[in-house]
Amino acid sequence: MILTTAAGYLGPAALGLAAAAMLANHRAVGLLWALLILLALLLIQVRNWFGLWSVLVSAAVVFGVSWWLQPQVQSAFAYSLTWFLLLAAPRPVLELQTQRRRRGPTLSDADQLARLTRVPALVWVGFFLVATVGALALGARWMVIAAA
């Protein structure tokens, strides 16, 4: 239960870091195919038509890029997706703390984790922030070194 609750905030950063590791090893096309596999697995969890549409369109775009475009474009696309994941990961954590500050303790994931573990919710928010910013810093370092 604890891992499931924490996964929503740490998942994008972890996926971005894994993608950065693949790019650091010059595996841009491999990253695109790994994303296709993850999108196919995501179809199991889709609960509505909008989710199905979103996953199928995303998969079609990733497939099209990985199959028909030039290697430079594939690499640029893979880097763009990775930067998006890494740069976007800290924002929900900041929004979580803003919501908690305005409304007080809520039913947020941090508050649920506090109830499950007896660790204060603010500590969980801090952990999420350190983990997502750390993943951003490490992933950025790997990608910048690989691109140089």
Regions found by a protein language model. Name each.
Residues 1-44:
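Membrane-embedded helix-turn/re-entrant segments that form the catalytic/gating core
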Residues 46-148:
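C-terminal membrane-associated helical module and adjoining short loops/tails
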